[in-house]
Amino acid sequence: MNNKINNIKITQVKSAIGRKYDQRLTLVGLGLNKINKSVILENTNSIKGMVEKVKHLLKIENM
């Protein structure tokens, strides 16, 4: 079996200023708080849902 875990690299490209409170909390939950900060996370359903909520503020790359 292939036990390889898919990861995604998420980079914040737009500011959270002026966004809804829940979108700002979602960015914090993803580990993002500054423009151009990147994190590498496992590609799980919960992470996909969080990314979908704020995808207009992010750049997403598969790894």
Curated annotation (Swiss-Prot):
Record's keyword annotation contains GTP-binding = no
Q: Which InterPro entries match?
A: Ribo_uL30_ferredoxin-like_sf, Ribosomal_uL30_bac-type, Ribosomal_uL30_ferredoxin-like
GO terms (molecular function) for this protein are: structural constituent of ribosome
Return the Pfam families for the record: Ribosomal_L30
UniProt entry keywords in alphabetical sequence: Ribonucleoprotein, Ribosomal protein
Of the GO CC terms on this record, one is: cytosolic large ribosomal subunit
Gene Ontology biological-process annotations: translation
Q: Which PANTHER family match?
A: LARGE RIBOSOMAL SUBUNIT PROTEIN UL30M, MITOCHONDRIAL RIBOSOMAL PROTEIN L30
Q: HAMAP family of this UniProt entry? A: Ribosomal_uL30_B (MF_01371_B)
Q: How does it assemble?
A: Part of the 50S ribosomal subunit.
Sequence similarity = Belongs to the universal ribosomal protein uL30 family.
Q: List the protein's name.
A: Large ribosomal subunit protein uL30
What is the species listed in this Swiss-Prot or TrEMBL entry? Rickettsia felis (strain ATCC VR-1525 / URRWXCal2) (Rickettsia azadi)
